[in-house]
Amino acid sequence: WWTLWRAIKPELERLAADETRFAGVTSLGVDEHIWHHGDPRRKGPRELTGMVDLTRDEDGRVHARLLDLVPGRSKKAYADWLTQRAEAFRAGIQIAARDPFRGYKSAIDDELAEATAVLDAFHVVKLGTQAMDEVRRRVQQDTTGHRGRNGDPLYGIQRLLRAGAENLTD
């Protein structure tokens, strides 16, 4: 491992220092990554903030491309990364996708004033599913007086409610 690392590290550092990788980014995504790999007693960041290019190609498809990872999960970690980018990069960002973490929204408001902040699709679906489950549980409790049990109609339709329309049949 160490022999391989010594061989590729200079090239990785050269690529990481190349600012041209930020050219043409108009849609920027940010999300955290919790690092669980390896021995938990080892040093190093446990939470990382990842920035991803979500710009669509000429066919309208997104080919998500990792731009960078920085230690921490905070407004400061993201805002510092943004301020280290060129003004032209920040001015070119039209859409800033994020998870519901308020710190990322604050950094976008402070550093990407012209960008439209949106929740990423994963978190929109997750929040919608959670809201639907809460309503289903509340209706179950109000109508039957107990939590859902096997055989209860609202308990039995959980998977149906979570299924995508493309997976449903008549």
Predicted regions, residues:
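Generic structural "secondary-structure junction" signal
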Residues: 69-72, 124-127, 134, 156, ...
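RNase H-like nuclease fold core
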Residues: 6-97, 102-107
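Non-catalytic alpha-helical coupling and interface elements of nucleotide-dependent molecular machines
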Residues: 9-13, 56, 113, 130-140, ...
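Key DNA-contact positions within bacterial/archaeal DNA-binding proteins
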Residues: 2
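Conserved beta-strand -> loop -> alpha-helix junction used to position metal-binding or nucleic-acid-contacting
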Residues: 99-102, 109-153
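Accessory helical subdomains and C-terminal extensions of nucleic-acid helicases
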Residues: 145-170
